């Protein structure tokens, strides 16, 4: 341990103790909050089903930084490199298109065996896995509809894909001893003025009911549904709106997914967490950074990321909120993108754990809003960085920007050799 780091840590302990915070307890609590890293940052959402195919569904990965993963082995190696630079508990979030098979597999026929390598890798790296059906980048989603499709056979294909995905998810949970959160997001919508907004939603409602009809062990699998305001090519109407999925999750008691980029730019999901928690059993969060639209920029340690973390901690939602990330930037080093975004999420959680929430609640209840604002602002200047650096030290990860040196070395030795 460096003398400088140790001295900063001791001073930080004293400073936080003065406001009633036990920093050791904060670090213990931080180790209770895994962050689920998304595999698709590593290859720009290409997957292994048809890596040369185009990305559809109203989403875009922009940029052409060299060295993206071309197969599962490369993606896992890149993930390992990123995870070595991120302290504390982690999970991995997979999409169905990241299956491994020597022969083509129709999406409605995916099975646990197509993901056994991921499970073995997760066991070796002490990770939980989460899952997603992939209802995009496919000939049967080309017209913009999947689970709400008017064609019975096409709709059934996507229903069967989601049902098969649930079994894969349950397999993850059973094998790894931690439930897999499986999130359903569909791109269904229309570009222009829509006359019949009801019928597609009726079809989606019935389709989802069929998807979740098979009872699975909640210790292995958790269903989640995700809304969106609009996508490219679906600007005027989205079948799976916020109101639709809030109603669905409430009435069916599934988890609700809130994506930071899936709402109007003036809305924030941090304000939605406490409201949703009154009605749904669990929340899945997709922490992202929308720049003017759902652009999925790398997560920053900004006001909204901090507000999301604070909501989780202030209301003791550790066991009801699942923290996932969802961004994909192809314009920068993809491993660095993972490291920056995931470390920022964990920093936000630590800062929330170092807040004297009980004292702030008392001030708020007493109507002393002056003191509340004053203390909230003074809190920002307390030496949380020293606590973060100690946390990194204890988890054998770089405390500061030294991690970038490791990324650069990996880029030179590994990424630069990829075609």
Curated annotation (Swiss-Prot):
The domain of life is: Bacteria
Miscellaneous: In the crystal structure, RhaA appears to bind a zinc ion at a structural site. However, the metal ion may be different in vivo.
Residues annotated to bind Zn(2+): 226, 259, 286, 326
Q: What is this protein called?
A: L-rhamnose isomerase
What is the cofactor note?
Answer: Binds 1 Mn(2+) ion per subunit.
**Family membership:** Belongs to the rhamnose isomerase family.
Please give the organism: Escherichia coli (strain K12)
Query: What cofactor is this protein dependent on?
Result: Mn(2+)
The coding gene here is rhaA
